[in-house]
Amino acid sequence: MTMNKSKLLEVNLRDFLEIRGEEKTHNLLDNFDSKYNEDVNYFLKTKAEEFGKRGLASTYLVFTKYKEKLEFLAYYSLAMKAVVIKSDANISKTLRKKINTYSNFEPKLKSYVMSCHLIGQLGKNYNANDESLISGSELLELACRKVRAAQEISGGKFVYLECENVKSLINFYEKNGFTKFGMRKLDKEETDLNGSYLVQLIRYLK
């Protein structure tokens, strides 16, 4: 468990299950509603627990104390993935140089390939008593801090994520230090998302 300066408590879902048990945990998750993204709801309620057990992704629940009770505000999920960045990606020279330092260039693919932390899910709970207790930027920064802590142990400097091709979403991530570098076609099981591809964004963590 991690408590930051803003009195936000981060708990790994696996730890929460062990402490509170399956029934209380599932009741908590069932009451979560991201409001704007059904995929975020679906992952938390049907996949997060299994992904944690199999070591595919770690999910962190974010709480705060509200009127003497713990209030479930949000969650995020992290995983490790191989990210492919094309050599002709429209990114700055500075970012390209940093990517070159931490990746392998594959001539046949004409791409940089590196193992990187992925923020797979990020969602606020709009069923919370006061949704203003955490902002989207604060939640994103919590996820990035968790990645940075992991990198202190295992190495690495980058984190990436994918989002729908929605201008407001892309602007949000860019304002929070991410840079657009590519697009990925949706998999067959990604049926709750709009469009035919996801926009990929990356950030260098100092």
Spans of model-derived segments:
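Non-catalytic substrate-recognition and accessory regions of acyl/acetyltransferase enzymes
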Residues: 1-130, 145-160, 164, 170-206
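Glycine-rich acyl-CoA binding loop
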Residues: 131-143
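Conserved short alpha-helix immediately C-terminal to the canonical SAM/SAH-binding motif I
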Residues: 139, 168-169
